[in-house]
């Protein structure tokens, strides 16, 4: 016996059999030990051969059990194992059989045949008793081998290669496991057209991720099964190659190539009956490539060129360009079929086709309006992915979310159960009390508990009944789906009696039962049963960060009160607030180009008048969040080269992988206000980047990705022309100096930049009467800082006037007021809090003195008998 002549699998089995013999206490190594490990193998090649040869694996196991128990056992001896005479003959016969068949190595099936043929071995009797004959085994082996010989030590891994390394899509289609494919007729027709060619009949589906390339292959499988293909493709098998399984576990050099050759050999032997589908086709290029080895694509090329291999590939545009086009010899063997993203209307049709599958899986209903919302909202708000994939994901997640709520206890019932638990704890505590009040309270608790437990039982029964009803509807849908699949199979097989029973008996009956189950509407139902546009919008909100009420709240009321809302934060700039509100209303009413940003504005005015504050207020109004804003200080972009910081460095430069400040912020959160502060400080070339943002709502970053700006509000602030606005009289209209200001602006910015901005808004200097309102806003912010300490500030009218007068400076706007409040209010307050004069929870009255403010705590450690000290500290 030469162990080198045996395959790795057989060597492994011999080793396992020896270990098994020793652990069983046997000193003789017999054929029974070998058969035992062969039959118990996880991959089951021997067991599969026995079954295919007409044998009974269970009988083989029972016979082996009996034979092994009869073998002599030795305990406490040495670990010496002796080869029995029958086993030596089995090995010799196996080598002889392999040699006759032209094999270079002894394989599992040759060893199994030898175990069945060698009369001196007990295994021959066991296999014979189980119905296995050497003749039947040889027939099955020849069927499996398909004329191939075992030329390598890993020969067994190449048997039934297609079954191991590919998935039969046509079989899945027959079993009804594939989702229906709606539309895409043109692409499927083009694919069939290429497949019907004589040579180079290999289409490759090229399109963006998520547009439905794999679905087209599944659509082709469904058409083949339904016979909806030309004669040349009738009864073909479409097999999806699993590159992961093909590469996994290929440890030794040349093993991967062997597996792939085995797959190709099976496809070629099928004489054109098998079409291979390779998803992510770019993985072929370089797959299995090691020193001196060929990669998968080179192994495929000859068969592809001769037309022996029918192949459908699928890959994305990016990967096709990066991997396949570089290999011109591979690219020319494939015929590209471009798959475009479907329109919103097509996506709605696709969702309607898939609706039943998702309803059946999640056991909830999906309304048609939810499908329309999923298609339209995903198209509008999820810009970095493609239809129909993103819309399908939305429906899937919305249904999953609803199902989670259905399975959880309803809020109403949960509150009652928590109250019952609370009352039970209180009842146990009161039972030990003897006073009259406690007894009276105990009686009231018993009464309330009785009522609540009754209500809880009713609600629980109602909840369970509703869940059961939902489950019944889902069960009927599943039965209906199975009946439809059975009808399709019966029609294909020509079983017309069965088809008639299903079509005119079972299916109409199930449809009626389902309609009855769904028509029973529950008034005041505890459970939501249907996915609505609201659920879809909530998922969008989770994905993108847009508050859901921004889309679903009646926006008319919200937009009509926009001036009032923003006016609470921005004082004295009525014209600016009105102008920006009108622009946003125009955009929301759909009267503005949807391919441009929501609005783009330049705010011009002196310092401290509220330009940046208006931007923050706008972000808070539109997105309910002050931080939904990217602030870019243009003073940092004074050099020409600094533009790369906005959009990312070009290839070959340091920082290429990092992306740009502007583009990355908008890619991560596409819905926000973008503030370019002090734009006149930036280099003029920086504005060239903004031209396409303002015009088309898009910008290409350093890595070639298109970033969508259609849902942003772009605001630029500047001090240009501020001298004209500062010198304006308190009651003068800003429009009187607009021409002068615009003259300065035009001298600084190019016409094509200014021409793309929606509106240039002028801010006038703050008036004296505006200062009181600004004092209140600033004091509210200070009050917020003190809220942790529960200290309340009460600012008297005289103190407000005092602060407004002291902080008013027409040239510098509201900023001097902030400094005055810091010096006259915050500093004394901080000192008093640290001294312990003002305690947590105090009310502090602030009044005006002659040259300072006075602080009087109403409650706390500060003594009313020490007014002199209070004034000193002020």
From Swiss-Prot:
The keyword Chaperone applies. Residues 3-147 form the Clp R domain. Induction: By heat and acid shock. Residues 83-147 are annotated as: Repeat 2. GO terms for molecular function: ATP binding; ATP hydrolysis activity. Residues 6-71 are annotated as: Repeat 1. Residues 766-874 are annotated as: C-terminal. Residues 555-765 are annotated as: NBD2. ATP 1 binds at residues 207-214. One of its GO terms (biological process) is protein refolding. Its main location: cytoplasm. Keywords: ATP-binding, Chaperone, Coiled coil, Cytoplasm, Nucleotide-binding, Repeat, Stress response. Residues 160-341 are annotated as: NBD1. Residues 392-524 form a coiled coil. It comes from the Bacteria. One of its GO terms (cellular component) is cytoplasm. Part of a stress-induced multi-chaperone system, it is involved in the recovery of the cell from heat-induced damage, in cooperation with DnaK, DnaJ and GrpE. Acts before DnaK, in the processing of protein aggregates. Protein binding stimulates the ATPase activity; ATP hydrolysis unfolds the denatured protein aggregates, which probably helps expose new hydrophobic binding sites on the surface of ClpB-bound aggregates, contributing to the solubilization and refolding of denatured protein aggregates by DnaK. Homohexamer. The oligomerization is ATP-dependent. Belongs to the ClpA/ClpB family. PANTHER family: ATP-DEPENDENT CLP PROTEASE, HEAT SHOCK PROTEIN 104. The Clp repeat (R) domain probably functions as a substrate-discriminating domain, recruiting aggregated proteins to the ClpB hexamer and/or stabilizing bound proteins. The NBD2 domain is responsible for oligomerization, whereas the NBD1 domain stabilizes the hexamer probably in an ATP-dependent manner. The movement of the coiled-coil domain is essential for ClpB ability to rescue proteins from an aggregated state, probably by pulling apart large aggregated proteins, which are bound between the coiled-coils motifs of adjacent ClpB subunits in the functional hexamer. This is Chaperone protein ClpB. It comes from Brucella suis biovar 1 (strain 1330).
């Amino acid at each position: 016996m030469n162990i080198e002549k045996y395959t790795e699998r057989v060597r492994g089995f011999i080793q396992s059999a020896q270990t098994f013999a020793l652990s069983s206490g046997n000193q003789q190594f017999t054929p029974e030990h070998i058969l035992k490990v062969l039959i118990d193998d996880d991959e089951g090649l021997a067991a599969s051969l026995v079954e295919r040869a007409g044998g009974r694996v269970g009988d083989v196991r029972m016979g082996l059990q009996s034979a092994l128990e009869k073998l002599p056992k030795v305990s406490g001896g040495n670990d010496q194992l002796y080869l029995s005479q029958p086993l030596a003959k089995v090995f010799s016969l196996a080598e002889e059989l392999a040699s006759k068949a032209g094999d270079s190595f002894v394989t599992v099936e040759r060893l199994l045949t030898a175990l069945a043929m060698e009369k001196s071995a007990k295994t021959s009797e066991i296999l014979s008793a189980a119905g296995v004959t050497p003749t039947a085994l040889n027939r099955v082996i020849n069927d499996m081998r398909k004329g191939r010989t075992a030329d390598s030590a890993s020969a067994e891994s190449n048997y039934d290669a297609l079954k191991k390394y590919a998935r039969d899509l046509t079989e899945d289609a027959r079993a009804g496991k594939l989702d229906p494919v709606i539309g895409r007729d043109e692409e499927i027709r083009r694919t069939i057209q290429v497949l019907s060619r004589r040579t180079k009949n290999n289409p490759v589906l090229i399109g963006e991720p998520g547009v439905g390339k794999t679905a087209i292959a599944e659509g082709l499988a469904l058409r083949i099964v339904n016979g909806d293909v030309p004669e040349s493709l009738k009864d073909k098998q479409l097999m999806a190659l699993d590159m992961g399984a093909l590469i996994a576990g290929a440890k030794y050099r040349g093993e991967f190539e062997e597996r792939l050759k085995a797959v190709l050999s099976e496809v070629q032997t099928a004489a054109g009956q098998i079409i291979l589908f390779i998803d992510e086709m770019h993985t072929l290029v370089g797959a299995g490539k090691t020193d001196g080895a060929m990669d998968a694509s080179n192994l495929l090329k000859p068969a592809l060129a001769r037309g022996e291999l029918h192949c459908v590939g699928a890959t994305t545009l990016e990967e096709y360009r990066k991997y396949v086009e570089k290999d011109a010899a591979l690219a020319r063997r494939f015929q590209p079929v471009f798959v475009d993203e479907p329109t919103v209307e097509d996506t709605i049709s696709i969702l309607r086709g898939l609706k039943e599958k998702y309803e059946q899986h999640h056991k909830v209903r999906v309304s048609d309006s939810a499908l329309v919302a999923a298609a339209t909202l995903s198209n509008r708000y999820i810009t970095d992915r493609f239809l129909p994939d993103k819309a399908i994901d939305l429906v899937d997640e919305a249904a999953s979310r609803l199902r989670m709520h259905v399975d959880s206890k309803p809020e109403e019932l949960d509150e009652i159960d928590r109250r019952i638990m609370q009352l039970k704890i209180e009842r146990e505590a009161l039972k030990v009390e003897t006073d009259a009040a406690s007894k009276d309270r105990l009686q009231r608790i018993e009464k309330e508990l009785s009522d609540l437990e009754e209500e809880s039982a009713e609600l629980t029964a109602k909840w369970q009944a509703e869940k059961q009803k939902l489950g019944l509807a889902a069960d009927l849908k599943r039965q209906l789906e199975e009946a439809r699949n059975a009808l399709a199979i019966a029609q294909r097989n020509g079983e017309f009696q069965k088809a008639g029973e299903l079509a005119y008996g079972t299916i109409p009956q199930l449809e009626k039962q389902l309609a009855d189950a769904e028509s029973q509407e529950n008034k005041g139902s505890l459970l939501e049963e249907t996915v609505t546009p609201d659920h879809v919008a909530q998922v969008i909100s989770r994905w993108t960060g847009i508050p859901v009420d921004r889309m679903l709240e009646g926006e008319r009321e919200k937009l009509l009160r926009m001036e009032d809302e923003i006016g609470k934060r921005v004082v004295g700039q009525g014209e600016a607030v009105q102008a920006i509100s009108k622009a946003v209303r125009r955009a929301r009413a759909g009267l503005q180009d949807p391919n441009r940003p929501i609005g783009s504005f330049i705010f011009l005015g002196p310092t401290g008048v509220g330009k940046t504050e208006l931007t923050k207020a706008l972000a808070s109004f539109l997105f309910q969040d002050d931080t939904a804003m990217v602030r870019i200080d243009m003073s940092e972009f004074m050099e020409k080269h600094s533009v790369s910081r906005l959009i990312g460095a070009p290839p070959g430069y340091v920082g290429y992988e990092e992306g740009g400040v502007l583009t990355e912020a908008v890619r991560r959160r596409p819905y926000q206000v973008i503030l370019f502060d002090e734009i006149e400080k930036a280099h003029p070339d920086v504005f060239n980047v903004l031209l396409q943002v303002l015009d088309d709502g898009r910008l290409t970053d350093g890595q070639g990705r298109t970033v969508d700006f259609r849902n942003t509000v772009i605001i630029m602030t500047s001090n240009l022309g501020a001298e004209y606005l500062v010198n304006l009289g308190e009651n003068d209209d800003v429009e009187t100096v607009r021409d002068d200001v615009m003259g300065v602006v035009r001298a600084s910015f190019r016409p094509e930049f200014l021409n793309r901005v929606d509106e240039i808004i002028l801010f006038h200097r703050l008036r004296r009467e505006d200062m009181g309102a600004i004092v209140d806003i600033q004091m509210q912010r200070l009050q917020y800082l003190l809220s942790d300490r529960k200290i309340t500030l009460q600012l008297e009218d005289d103190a407000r006037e005092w602060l407004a007068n002291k902080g008013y400076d027409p040239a510098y706007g509201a900023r001097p007021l902030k400094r005055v409040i810091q010096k006259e209010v915050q500093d004394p307050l901080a000192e008093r809090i640290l001294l312990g004069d003002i305690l947590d929870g105090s009310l502090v009255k602030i009044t005006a003195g002659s040259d300072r403010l006075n602080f009087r705590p109403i409650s706390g450690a500060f003594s009313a008998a020490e007014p002199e000290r209070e004034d000193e500290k002020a």
